[in-house]
UniProtKB/Swiss-Prot annotation:
This is Calcium-dependent mitochondrial ATP-magnesium/phosphate carrier protein 3. PROSITE patterns: EF_HAND_1, EF_HAND_2, SOLCAR. The chain crosses the membrane at residues 209-226, 261-280, 304-317, 356-375, 398-415, 450-469. Residues 33-68, 69-104, 105-135, 136-171 form the EF-hand domain. The N-terminal domain can bind calcium. Calcium-dependent mitochondrial carrier protein that catalyzes the import of ATP co-transported with metal divalent cations across the mitochondrial inner membrane in exchange for phosphate (Pi). Can transport phosphate, AMP, ADP, ATP, adenosine 5'-phosphosulfate, sulfate and thiosulfate, and, to a lesser extent, other nucleotides. Binds calcium ions Ca(2+). Also mediates calcium uptake. InterPro entries: EF-hand-dom_pair, EF_Hand_1_Ca_BS, EF_hand_dom, Mit_carrier, Mitochondrial_sb/sol_carrier, Mt_carrier_dom_sf. Residues 227-260, 318-355, 416-449 are mitochondrial matrix. PANTHER family: SOLUTE CARRIER FAMILY 25. GO terms for molecular function: ADP transmembrane transporter activity; AMP transmembrane transporter activity; ATP transmembrane transporter activity; calcium ion binding; calcium ion transmembrane transporter activity; phosphate transmembrane transporter activity. Residues 1-208, 281-303, 376-397, 470-479 are mitochondrial intermembrane.
Amino acid sequence: MESSKPKNRNPMKKPVSITMEHVLLALRETMDEREIRIRSLFDFFDNSNLGFLDYAQIEKGLASLQIPPEYKYARDLFRVCDANRDGRVDYQEFRRYIDAKELELYRIFQAIDVEHNGCILPEELWEALVKAGIEIDDEELARFVEHVDKDNNGTITFEEWRDFLLLYPHEATLENIYHHWERVCLIDIGEQAVIPDGISKHVKRSRLLLAGGLAGAVSRTATAPLDRLKVVLQVQRAHAGVLPTIKKIWREDKLMGFFRGNGLNVMKVAPESAIKFCAYEMLKPMIGGEDGDIGTSGRLMAGGMAGALAQTAIYPMDLVKTRLQTCVSEGGKAPKLWKLTKDIWVREGPRAFYKGLFPSLLGIVPYAGIDLAAYETLKDLSRTYILQDTEPGPLIQLSCGMTSGALGASCVYPLQVVRTRMQADSSKTTMKQEFMNTMKGEGLRGFYRGLLPNLLKVVPAASITYIVYEAMKKNMALD
């Protein structure tokens, strides 16, 4: 935004006291006129003249208002209005909701309207959003104002503000108002860097990125034994059970053997997250249209390309990690990292650090596509059959994310096995040769070695990531 925008104000400072008289004055209506307006709105929903509203009437009324799906909260609105929980909303309950909501909306309207001229100017809205931790550019601000400003005069009156949010049953904070269509689901199962949703519009994006990175590091460390077990099983040609492999790892290195390679796995988080985020932000305007909205397919494309770039950049670390996890201990000791890296460079050349990159990149877009499709489907199913049209909360979203992530990982798992075997093999085996060797020697079963520990780590990895991320946000004052 231009430097002429007002500075050093506190637009979120609350007025001393807000009464219904303030609301009437702002709306330029009398108490009787307001009563008629509220009664008309109630009658609009009560089109059967029952004298009360049920959930079906509220849902039907919202649908006839042509409110976009992301703004529909029929179940929540019904629950908030039904104060005595008798399954129906009478006029007095409906009126009490409207009274409380209009007072709440006027309170935040006054907090944004620092000039106190009865309307919100774009620069006032911009400053309030920034104070709330939301950073938007001129085009996004113009679209936001245009959405609320019904008479298109460039400012927002309280009447327009009220009409936009009157049927929004949740707390009307600025962050809720701007982000209530966004859903956060942070899932890290140790395969690729996770970028927190909504981060690109947050002024403290670097701190959010740090919080996500630290959460991923803690999660990967906690699930490192399962990761080591998975990799060891993936490279074994002969059938080997989980328990014999666990005993083998214990015999070689005792407890620390289960954490071999975890240091590199954690070190990958920061550069991979940073590269993926920066690449994603650069690709968005190239893929998006004039309105800046890239849509679901655009997000999938931009995310896939950003993920491929990040994966390529940190791939040598991933290969060395695999070699470290799969090589045999010498004299009961794990090989030194620097010696292992040097041996690869000297014996196999620099190209060896990119063995298995192609199958790794091949799996990125299918994994993301399956993950996204499954997540949205599960969320819709939970909304329909479990929550009765209420928006799913963090726990449901986390469960949907874990399930979709596990499904996506399972579908592309054969590519992951081929990649791991190519990484661990010092010979110049191509992807096609590795596929043929596995199919010929082990059949389809060979492509799913290590799948069990991979799936077992999904729940703890995702849960730990989510808990640590939320705790970090709280400690960094990012909520």
